[in-house]
């Protein structure tokens, strides 16, 4: 803790700062029965196992995300991600701690992506298309090049016969992938795109044929 927060202070000053702040925390976080959040000894600082509390970070870390099949439970976990880790926290001359914050943010963002991916998969498999599309839109803001997500979105649009939307989305995804990553979509995704592009062409031809039939002049 000293190396994170008071690395440039003298040893005596750093230890004093640590003792004072631990005392402040112990005094502030006390249950009705007198139990404090922290147990502090000469050599150890740890969380009191008898102290009852809820912590969003702990809940996110302890969840076995890949094994959760409850959409409601995953939605609850998603609701725990509120802003960045130590958001709006500015600490001067604490480079080690700032590096730790960045690492934790990266870790938590990856956990958030796992939650999104599980929700997308489960809502898709349960034909909850509106929810699935909503989760995909949010997920694409932090994971814009994921072809598995693009494939699910296209399959939903195909299922809805939304050929025009499917073509527009595929073209956007293709352009973004080529521009930002320098790669084309996988052969599987390109093959899938042929389905809705062919269907869109057929729909256009049918509309033209219908227009021609409707505009044939009547015989005298």
Feature map (PLM): residue ranges:
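Interdomain "pre-motor" coupling segment immediately N-terminal to P-loop NTPase/helicase cores
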Residues: 179-210
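Residues within the DNA-recognition helix of helix-turn-helix
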Residues: 21, 152, 169
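Boundary/linker segments of alpha-helical solenoid repeat arrays
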Residues: 85-91, 147-148, 175-188
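Intrinsically disordered, low-complexity protein-interaction/activation regions
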Residues: 2-134, 138-143, 147-148, 165, ...
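TPR/TPR-like (Sel1-like) alpha-helical repeat modules
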Residues: 158-183
């Amino acid at each position: 803790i000293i190396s994170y927060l008071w690395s440039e202070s003298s040893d005596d000053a750093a230890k004093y700062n640590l003792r004072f702040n631990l005392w402040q925390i112990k005094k502030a976080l006390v249950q009705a029965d007198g139990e404090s959040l922290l147990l502090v000894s000469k050599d150890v600082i740890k969380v009191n196992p008898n102290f009852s509390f809820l912590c969003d970070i702990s809940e996110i870390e302890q969840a076995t995300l890949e094994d959760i099949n409850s959409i409601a439970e995953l939605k609850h976990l998603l609701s725990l991600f509120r802003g960045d880790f130590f958001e709006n926290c500015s600490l001067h001359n604490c480079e080690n701690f700032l590096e730790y914050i960045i690492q934790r943010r990266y870790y938590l963002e990856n956990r958030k992506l796992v939650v999104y991916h599980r929700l997308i998969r489960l809502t898709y498999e349960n034909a909850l298309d509106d929810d699935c599309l909503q989760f995909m839109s949010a997920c694409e803001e932090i994971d814009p090049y994921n072809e598995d997500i693009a494939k699910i979105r296209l399959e939903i649009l195909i299922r809805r016969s939304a050929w025009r939307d499917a073509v527009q989305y595929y073209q956007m995804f293709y352009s973004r992938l080529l521009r930002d990553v320098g790669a084309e979509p996988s052969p599987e995704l390109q093959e899938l795109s042929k389905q809705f592009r062919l269907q869109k062409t057929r729909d256009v031809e049918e509309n033209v044929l219908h227009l021609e039939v409707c505009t044939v002049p009547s015989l005298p």
